[in-house]
């Protein structure tokens, strides 16, 4: 039996979650509903043509209040209050909360009132029953976890790397910088924004701003709580980001040991989540890459044995959207 999911919010993440399900060919998850306040025809057009990921490789049909992307009609609604969505009627197992609005447990729980069995939020969520980075701590999911956060794209990139390196050599303390592609909450020209850095034109400057992604690793890996912090620099590219992590190891290590630990994990327990490259790649090379994190082996540096610097790439849209599907399926198996 496939897990039935409904997508609330058909923006960058909502559309990519559906596309990732279709393109991967997976049959263990079925999208039965989409809720978005935009016209059905507009949502279909934006799904069909994507400036970042290219044209959808299949046919997209609209008939009444449905969209068909190759697996039969998907019901489309335009309801403002998630508590009023037809989850019960449609037998929704997992509501994928992708609006970026209902990001606290209390707000996201409206989907439960509508009849969904569980909710997965596509962002950090205050008060969530559990914050999950698939491949790192998804096995902690239990029947008690009704509202779950899928963390952020940056935490999904950092956590697998941090887990492997903490297990291998120990992390005393560390600081991460994410060099991050601009996103939809940044303007094309200067305008009002509560964050004055993000008030500036996205494609014209490198923009320092904040991120809670490093601290959030402590929610996923309690052994690293309080040991990591970070910052963000938004750059004038539309997709693909990279983390630059510097940490103090608990014991002396080497570039070779660090890289070997990553290669071993990426080839075994974290295969499909953590990847690696030894090529002189640049950001565009990782566009549409489904990994949560792709470690750049030749960028590893070790100073005086214990000061370590590593670099890992991530498609901040596509990788995260693939993990939304993975986590939703894991939640669906809870019953």
From Swiss-Prot:
Enzyme Commission number(s): 1.2.1.12
Site (Activates thiol group during catalysis): 180
Protein location: Cytoplasm
GO CC terms, sorted: cytoplasm
List of residues binding D-glyceraldehyde 3-phosphate: 152-154, 183, 198, 211-212, 234
Keyword check for Oxidoreductase: yes
Keywords annotated in UniProt: Cytoplasm, Glycolysis, NAD, Nucleotide-binding, Oxidoreductase
First-tier enzyme category under EC: oxidoreductase
GO molecular function: glyceraldehyde-3-phosphate dehydrogenase (NAD+) (phosphorylating) activity; NAD binding; NADP binding
PANTHER family: GLYCERALDEHYDE-3-PHOSPHATE DEHYDROGENASE 2 (PTHR43148)
Subunit structure: Homotetramer.
Reported function: Catalyzes the oxidative phosphorylation of glyceraldehyde 3-phosphate (G3P) to 1,3-bisphosphoglycerate (BPG) using the cofactor NAD. The first reaction step involves the formation of a hemiacetal intermediate between G3P and a cysteine residue, and this hemiacetal intermediate is then oxidized to a thioester, with concomitant reduction of NAD to NADH. The reduced NADH is then exchanged with the second NAD, and the thioester is attacked by a nucleophilic inorganic phosphate to produce BPG.
Name the record gives this protein: Glyceraldehyde-3-phosphate dehydrogenase
């Amino acid at each position: 039996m496939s897990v039935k999911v409904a997508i609330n919010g058909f923006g960058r993440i909502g559309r990519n979650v559906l596309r990732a399900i279709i393109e991967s060919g997976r049959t263990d998850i079925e999208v039965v509903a989409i809720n978005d306040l935009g016209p059905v025809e507009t949502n279909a057009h934006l799904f069909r043509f994507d400036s970042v990921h290219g044209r959808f490789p299949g046919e997209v049909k609209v008939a009444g209040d449905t969209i068909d992307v190759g697996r039969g009609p998907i019901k489309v609604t335009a309801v403002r209050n998630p508590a009023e969505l037809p989850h019960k009627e449609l037998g929704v197992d997992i509501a994928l909360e992708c609006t970026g609005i209902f990001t606290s447990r209390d707000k996201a729980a409206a989907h439960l009132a509508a009849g969904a069995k569980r909710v997965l939020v596509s962002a950090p969520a205050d008060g969530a029953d559990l914050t999950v980075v698939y491949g790192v701590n998804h096995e902690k999911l239990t029947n008690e976890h009704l509202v779950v956060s899928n963390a952020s794209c940056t935490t999904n990139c950092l956590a697998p790397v941090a887990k492997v390196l903490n297990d291998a050599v120990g992390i005393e303390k560390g600081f991460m910088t994410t060099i991050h592609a601009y996103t939809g909450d940044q303007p094309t020209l200067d305008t009002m924004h509560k964050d004055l850095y993000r008030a500036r034109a996205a494609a014209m400057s490198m923009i320092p701003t904040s991120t809670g992604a490093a601290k959030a690793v402590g929610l996923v890996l309690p052994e690293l709580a309080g040991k990591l912090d970070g910052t963000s620099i938004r750059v004038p590219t539309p997709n693909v980001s990279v983390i630059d992590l510097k940490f103090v190891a608990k014991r002396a290590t080497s570039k070779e040991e660090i890289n070997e630990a990553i290669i071993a994990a990426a080839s075994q327990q974290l295969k499909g989540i953590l990847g690696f490259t030894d090529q002189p790649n640049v950001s565009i090379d990782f566009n549409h890459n489904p990994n949560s994190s792709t470690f750049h082996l030749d960028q590893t540096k070790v100073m005086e044995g214990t000061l370590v610097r590593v670099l890992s790439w991530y498609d901040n849209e596509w990788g995260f959207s693939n993990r939304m599907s993975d986590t939703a399926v894991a939640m669906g198996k809870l019953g």
